[in-house]
Every structure is written in C-alpha cells, then in structure tokens.
C-alpha cells in the first residue's frame, strides 16, 4: 500500500516519539524528509539526523532523527501541525507569510528556492506552499 502523505507521516512519527520521550525516530528516507530534518536541526528542534543504507534483506534507506530534550527532559518541540495536505493545498505569497506563535515557532515552506523557514522566505521575498508549523 502506498503512503498518501509522507510528510504528515514524518511529522506524526516525530510528534509521537517526542511525547513518549524517545531519543530517536526511524522512518523511511526521502529527499524532502531530509530537508525538513535539516530545517528542524538548524532551528534547534532536534539534535541531528543521518541516513542509513538498507540492512541486508531490507528495502530502501532509512532516516534517523535524534530528538532534543532540555536538562530535565523538557521537550524542545511543543507542537507540530501539518498545514498543506494532499486534499487541500495551502499557499502563501511572500507578502503574506504566516507567523507561528508570533515568531516563536517556525513555518516550513516549499518554495522555488527549496524548503525554507518563514523568516528565510521573507528575506528572499519568495512565497510557496506552507507545509507545516513547528513550535
């Protein structure tokens, strides 16, 4: 069975692992998931990520995301929300980019310049598809 929304699957895996205080999340690899993980690392929501080649007998590479917690196991990710979905795409112009919690969170936007945060897209004056909010 094919996956309808791999981005929502990734965000759900990260959200669930974060709520269960897991140290890492394993998921199927794709380029867009790698770019989302890169943005999450740049913004300080995760410790890091890496891609592993398939084990013998396994199909496809896996993306492993290392989650980040505070000194007393406080979660660095308070919430994640998928905005643009396969059934309802959401786009934003460069003049109308969303702010997540007044700038405390980050919006991940797919632009012609690649995946960018709302701040990066605003500086470059490009709009695009609003994939998700993270706070």
UniProtKB/Swiss-Prot annotation:
One of its GO terms (biological process) is translation. The lineage of its organism: Bacteria, Bacillati, Actinomycetota, Actinomycetes, Frankiales. One of the primary rRNA binding proteins, it binds directly to 16S rRNA central domain where it helps coordinate assembly of the platform of the 30S subunit. One of its GO terms (molecular function) is rRNA binding. Part of the 30S ribosomal subunit. Contacts proteins S5 and S12. Pfam families: Ribosomal_S8. It comes from Parafrankia sp. (strain EAN1pec). This is Small ribosomal subunit protein uS8. Belongs to the universal ribosomal protein uS8 family. It comes from the Bacteria. Keywords: Ribonucleoprotein, Ribosomal protein, RNA-binding, rRNA-binding. InterPro entries: Ribosomal_uS8, Ribosomal_uS8_sf. One of its GO terms (cellular component) is ribonucleoprotein complex.
């Amino acid at each position: 069975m094919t996956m309808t929304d791999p981005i929502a699957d990734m965000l759900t895996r990260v959200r669930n692992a974060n709520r269960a205080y897991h140290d890492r999340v394993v998921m199927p690899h794709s380029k867009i998931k790698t770019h989302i993980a890169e943005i999450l690392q740049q913004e300080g929501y995760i410790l890091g990520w890496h891609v592993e080649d398939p084990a013998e007998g396994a199909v496809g590479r896996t993306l492993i995301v290392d989650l980040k917690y505070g000194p007393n196991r406080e979660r660095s990710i308070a919430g994640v929300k998928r905005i643009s979905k396969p059934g309802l795409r959401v786009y934003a112009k460069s003049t109308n980019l969303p702010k997540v919690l007044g700038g405390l969170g980050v919006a991940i936007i797919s632009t012609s310049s690649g995946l960018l945060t709302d701040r990066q897209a605003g500086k470059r004056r490009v709009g695009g598809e609003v994939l998700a909010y993270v706070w």
